[in-house]
Design a protein with these regions (language model features):
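Catalytic core of non-heme Fe(II) oxygenases with the double-stranded beta-helix
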Residues: 65-140
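Non-heme Fe(II)/2-oxoglutarate
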Residues: 1-87
Length: 140
């Protein structure tokens, strides 16, 4: 089985703008998210804005929790259609992170459970190549 799969254009540009504007208007953001918990005080310069929407069954924003639960259903259906494979039903957490070109994300595993899946989405409605940025999955 592959380590990662790619699904493009799950939501259209209009919907992306709607959820993007909703997200940036939500007051639940914190500015101290890190990819790895550490006691190193200097690591705080690598923090980025983040929001916990849902964690271990606890919803912190009912609207966004419902939105991302529904979006996950759409992704799972598209995944089944494209790859003929069922993703697990349970969702352990929905966390959001806002990154920019200076954000440093260290290599990490989202979960220790080898059966767990991560759905990583990009919700930037307008993107230009000069903005930079990339995602590195297992060195690829």
């Amino acid at each position: 089985m592959k380590k990662y799969y790619i699904l493009d254009n799950i939501i259209d540009k209009t919907e992306t703008f709607k959820i993007y504007n909703n997200l940036i208007s939500t007051p639940s953001w914190t500015l101290n998210r890190l990819t790895d918990d550490t006691n190193d005080l200097e690591s705080s310069i690598n923090c980025f804005p983040g929001m916990v929407v849902e964690d271990k069954g606890q919803s912190y924003n009912t609207y966004l929790s419902g939105y991302f639960q529904f979006l996950t259903t759409i992704i799972k259906n598209e995944f089944k259609k494209q790859y003929n494979f069922d993703l697990p039903e349970n969702i352990l957490r929905i966390h959001l992170g806002a990154k920019n070109h200076k954000s440093e994300t260290l290599f990490h595993a989202d979960m220790e459970d080898s059966r767990a899946w991560t759905i990583l989405g990009f919700l930037t409605p307008v993107w230009k190549a000069e903005y930079g940025g990339n995602i590195n999955l297992e060195g690829e």
